[in-house]
Amino acid sequence: MREPDFLNHFLKKGYFKKHAKAVLALSGGLDSMFLFKVLSTYQKELEIELILAHVNHKQRIESDWEEKELRKLAAEAELPIYISNFSGEFSEARARNFRYDFFQEVMKKTGATALVTAHHADDQVETILMRLIRGTRLRYLSGIKEKQVVGEIEIIRPFLHFQKKDFPSIFHFEDTSNQENHYFRNRIRNSYLPELEKENPRFRDAILGIGNEILDYDLAIAELSNNINVEDLQQLFSYSESTQRVLLQTYLNRFPDLNLTKAQFAEVQQILKSKSQYRHPIKNGYELIKEYQQFQICKISPQADEEEDELVLHYQNQVAYQGYLFSFGLPLEGESIQQIPVSRETSIHIRHRKTGDVLIQNGHRKKLRRLFIDLKIPMEKRNSALIIEQFGEIVSILGIATNNLSKKTKNDIMNTVLYIEKIDR
């Protein structure tokens, strides 16, 4: 194939329509060097600004020389290049994580929104076979995605439909370690695939076909289940166990960087079935939150360094706090105004719950923890509930319960009213 053929493929696919700046992961191998040649030659036609990024893994004597040559290449092409050196104990997984962390840093620094890699069809076959041997979940056997959105960036693999033999022989660096069978991928490439192709000369096509078929099923299930609210457990549990598993797995596809193992997936299933309330980190910065018949998986929110101090409100004063207007003894007008009988003899304290909090109801003391459980108050609401306190005792849990003190105060000569209005925060 000629370079213009690759350009036409890129334009037809519209890989770069949404992007003005793209970072190319440049290893120096034939595939990435040819991709560099195509992208740098046709920057104008593709309407992109190209930025190069290279990781020197420091595993071969030649790697420092190759780094220098890539710097020269970038200078000749008048393109910026960012380079980082891997350090620490080497493994395939550590190196991959290091590369992608570095690429994201470069993208953040340059304002690029696309990361372009030179993965091709042969890489896809190796990846699917590796995952099959390791016993991965079915959805991952669809292989590497042609386009993949991760957070605010998009990873684009424009060579995924081409084999390495489709690329012309141009200047590149040959990694001699690829001929060694120390790493799993090398054993797949050098040993397992050639043996399997003896049994079926079209084995590579067969593997790619299976991957595409799994992807079709995955997309079809996502489309068919679009109107099912999986986070509603009553709805989820109305289906058979098998359908529940498929729906839950499809729901998890929304979080591409979560990557639960089979054991972790089974644990999530068990929590959804057995726990009434649950909030705990699960993996990769995500947490699982369950509140009775609802659950969600979301990124862990950063916590404030310090808890907000409690608020003290004096008689005949007003204050806006946590989305409410509190008016101590000064009437507020409106249909949605809450009124709580209080005493004007001392100030009112407004705060969130504390360990050991007790509410008096019908002459009986009840711990807030037990009250919340009995009333099935969701954990989020428990943590955000506002406590109104006077004389060292809880007068009211806003919108949830009041105690006998407020009823007694209603008939007291020193009584007044705390007026509360919901306002926009």
From Swiss-Prot:
Highest taxon of source: Bacteria
Q: Per UniProt, where does ATP bind?
A: S27, G28, G29, L30, D31, S32
List the GO terms this entry assigns under cellular component, sorted alphabetically: cytoplasm
EC number(s) given by UniProt? 6.3.4.19
Q: Name one Pfam family in it.
A: TilS_C
Keywords, ordered alphabetically: ATP-binding, Cytoplasm, Ligase, Nucleotide-binding, tRNA processing
Question: Which InterPro entries does the UniProt record give?
Answer: Lysidine-tRNA-synth_C, Rossmann-like_a/b/a_fold, TilS/TtcA_N, tRNA_Ile_lys_synt, tRNA_Ile_lys_synt_N
**Which Gene3D superfamilies does its entry note?**
HUPs (3.40.50.620)
- Please give the SUPFAM superfamilies that the UniProt record associates with this protein: Adenine nucleotide alpha hydrolases-like, PheT/TilS domain
One MF term in the entry's GO annotations: tRNA(Ile)-lysidine synthase activity
Q: Which GO terms describe its biological process?
A: tRNA modification
Subcellular localization, as worded in the UniProt entry: Cytoplasm
Quickly give the catalysed reaction.
Answer: cytidine(34) in tRNA(Ile2) + L-lysine + ATP = lysidine(34) in tRNA(Ile2) + AMP + diphosphate + H(+)
| Functional note | Ligates lysine onto the cytidine present at position 34 of the AUA codon-specific tRNA(Ile) that contains the anticodon CAU, in an ATP-dependent manner. Cytidine is converted to lysidine, thus changing the amino acid specificity of the tRNA from methionine to isoleucine.
Family named by the database record = Belongs to the tRNA(Ile)-lysidine synthase family.
Description of its domains: The N-terminal region contains the highly conserved SGGXDS motif, predicted to be a P-loop motif involved in ATP binding.
Name of protein: tRNA(Ile)-lysidine synthase
Q: Which gene encodes it?
A: tilS
